[in-house]
Amino acid sequence: RLCLSDYSIFSETIEICPEGHNYCFKKFPKGITRLPWVIRGCAATCPKPEAQVYVDCCARDKCNR
């Protein structure tokens, strides 16, 4: 799986996920959708949502844009 570890309208950084990490995710505080508060990466399971933190989890290459 290929996931984004960083993304902007100008560039993106791709991370090759280790074996067994089949999900891409992004998470950020609710109400703030811009960097530097967005965290992206690979995961073996979808991260659990936290209070006041939005989590988006997907299972396609580079789907955590």
Curated annotation (Swiss-Prot):
PROSITE patterns: SNAKE_TOXIN. Expressed by the venom gland. GO terms for molecular function: toxin activity. SUPFAM superfamilies: Snake toxin-like. Its main location: secreted. One of its GO terms (biological process) is venom-mediated suppression of blood coagulation. It holds the Pfam family Toxin_cobra-type. Disulfide bonds join C3-C24, C17-C42, C46-C57, C58-C63. Keywords: Blood coagulation cascade inhibiting toxin, Disulfide bond, Hemostasis impairing toxin, Neurotoxin, Secreted, Toxin. It is found in: Secreted. InterPro entries: Snake_3FTx, Snake_toxin-like_sf, Snake_toxin_con_site, Toxin_cobra-type. GO terms for cellular component: extracellular region. Belongs to the three-finger toxin family. Short-chain subfamily. Orphan group I sub-subfamily. Has anticoagulant activity, since it is able to inhibit the activation of coagulation factor X (F10) by coagulation factor VIIa (F7) (IC(50)=123.8 nM). Also shows weak irreversible neurotoxicity. This is Ringhalexin. It comes from Hemachatus haemachatus (Rinkhals).
